[in-house]
């Protein structure tokens, strides 16, 4: 089949299809003239004269494309009548909405408020006993919607208890979340959470609201409770500070008592002599010590007595009359370098509890070669100080001494 034959065949098919469509449209228009559609009004112009009278051009000239006849199809004609139909629906819908919004919602609210009123009047005596003490503290807006029935002036109105009993009875489940939140706001309770949480607060939340009020009223008589703990801690610290200040005024306690040669064994000896002078001042301070102050005291003892073990420091901490020299305030540097923390390096090994042995601290024999200054000299690259007289400790060292000059050079580096 050639290309010309295929194109000719397609033209014939198209012309036949057009002729069939035009014939159907003509027959439909003829039926509309004989039996007019009730939707079409009589004032519309006639559709028939717009069509040609003869059918010959539709049937016998299939190849010619005629202009589309000017007529309105039946599915387009109701558009002129659509405004009337839409007006009917527009008039009916607002009526339904108005009646629903104006009349329907007040019915369950009026019923739910009238029924608990009857229940409250039936319950009677338990109502005033529950709310008798709290009526004077209720806010005024809560009292306005409650009186629904007029009462004689001589009789006190029982309307507030039924209104509050309504919120404590069966009708709690019927209330919406917004109404529950509104009632919780009136009672001063939190309004966040699910409906079950709100119902639990409504059932058992009103009496706890009155419990913290006596605390607020009684709080001006005493100290306010948020500031009570810091004041107590400050007072305990002030009382605890009497002990180091009293120890600083003692003349018989020399700084040489800290040296490893004499060892910390002689340090408890002046304690019985000065014990009666310290008992009235350090007694309340030691009784009021907290965990934080105990830790600070242990750190201070570890800094002042590097040759003593941790067990000895903790045991001496229980005794409040143990004499200790005060912390030198002019010592160059922070105490974090000297504190026996496991994370610190270098200098922390000087004050660790594993270096001095308990035999060394209890006997006046010459000191162990692994002493604090030996470690410092080993770190700084100097010769060991095992031979020779025992030098004083870090806190009693003389800055002009040539043997301890390397120590201060080493300690100045981190700062």
Swiss-Prot record:
Chain's gene name: MAMSTR
Biased amino acid composition, Low complexity: 41-53, 274-290, 343-365, 394-408
GO MF entries: transcription coregulator activity
CC terms in the record's Gene Ontology section: nucleus
Keywords annotated in UniProt: Activator, Nucleus, Transcription, Transcription regulation
InterPro entries: SAP_dom, SAP_dom_sf, TransReg_TumorExp
Compartments, as annotated in UniProt: Nucleus
UniProt motif (MEF2-binding) ranges: 12-28
Domain of life (superkingdom): Eukaryota
PANTHER family: LYSINE-RICH CEACAM1 CO-ISOLATED PROTEIN LYRIC PROTEIN, MEF2-ACTIVATING MOTIF AND SAP DOMAIN-CONTAINING TRANSCRIPTIONAL REGULATOR
Biased composition (Acidic residues): 312-322
GO biological process, one term: positive regulation of myotube differentiation
Biased composition (Pro residues): 147-162, 263-273
SAP domain span: 172-206
Keyword Transcription regulation in annotation: yes
Ranges for region Transcription activation: 215-415
Chain positions covered by the region annotation Disordered: 28-56, 70-415
UniProt cross-references to SUPFAM superfamilies, sorted A to Z: SAP domain
Tissues expressed in: Expressed in skeletal muscle, brain, placenta and spleen.
Protein function: Transcriptional coactivator. Stimulates the transcriptional activity of MEF2C. Stimulates MYOD1 activity in part via MEF2, resulting in an enhancement of skeletal muscle differentiation.
Protein name: MEF2-activating motif and SAP domain-containing transcriptional regulator
Comp. bias (Basic and acidic residues): 78-94, 163-174, 198-219
Quaternary state and interactors: Interacts with MEF2C.
High-level lineage: Eukaryota, Metazoa, Chordata, Craniata, Vertebrata
């Amino acid at each position: 089949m050639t290309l010309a034959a295929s194109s000719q065949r397609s033209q014939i098919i198209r012309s036949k299809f057009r002729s069939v469509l035009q014939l159907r449209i003509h027959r439909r228009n003829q039926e509309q003239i004989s039996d007019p559609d009730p939707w079409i009004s009589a004032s519309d112009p006639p559709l028939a004269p717009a069509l040609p009278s003869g059918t010959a051009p539709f049937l016998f000239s299939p190849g010619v494309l005629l202009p589309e006849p000017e007529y309105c199809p039946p599915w387009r004609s109701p558009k002129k009548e659509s405004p009337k139909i839409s007006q009917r629906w527009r008039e009916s819908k607002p009526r339904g909405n108005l009646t629903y919004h104006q009349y329907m919602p007040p019915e369950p609210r009026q019923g739910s408020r009238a029924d608990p009123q009857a229940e409250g009047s039936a319950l009677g005596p338990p109502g005033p006993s529950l709310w008798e003490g709290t009526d004077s503290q209720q806010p005024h807006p809560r009292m306005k919607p409650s009186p629904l029935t007029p009462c004689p002036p001589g009789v006190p109105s029982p309307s507030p208890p039924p209104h509050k009993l309504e919120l404590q009875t069966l009708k709690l489940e019927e209330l919406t979340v917004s109404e529950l939140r509104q009632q919780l706001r009136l009672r001063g309770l939190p309004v966040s959470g699910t409906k079950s949480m709100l119902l639990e607060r409504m059932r058992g939340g009103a009496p706890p609201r009155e419990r913290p009020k006596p605390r607020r009223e009684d709080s001006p008589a005493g100290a306010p409770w948020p500031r009570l703990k810091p004041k107590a801690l400050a007072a305990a610290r002030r009382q605890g500070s009497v002990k180091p200040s009293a120890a600083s005024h003692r003349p018989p306690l020399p700084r040489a008592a800290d040296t490893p040669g004499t060892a910390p064994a002689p340090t408890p000896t002046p304690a019985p002599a000065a014990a009666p002078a310290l008992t009235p001042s350090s007694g309340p301070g030691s009784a009021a010590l907290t965990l934080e102050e105990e830790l600070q005291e242990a750190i201070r003892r570890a800094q002042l007595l590097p040759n003593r073990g941790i067990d000895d420091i903790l045991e001496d901490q229980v005794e409040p009359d143990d004499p200790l020299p005060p912390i030198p305030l002019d010592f160059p540097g922070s105490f974090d370098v000297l504190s026996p923390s496991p994370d610190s390096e270098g200098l922390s090994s000087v004050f660790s509890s594993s270096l001095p042995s308990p035999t060394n601290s209890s006997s006046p024999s010459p000191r162990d070669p692994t002493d604090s200054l030996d470690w410092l000299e080993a770190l700084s690259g100097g010769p060991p100080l095992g031979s020779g007289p025992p030098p004083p400790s870090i806190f009693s060292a003389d800055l002009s001494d040539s043997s301890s000059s390397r120590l201060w050079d080493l300690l100045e580096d981190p700062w």
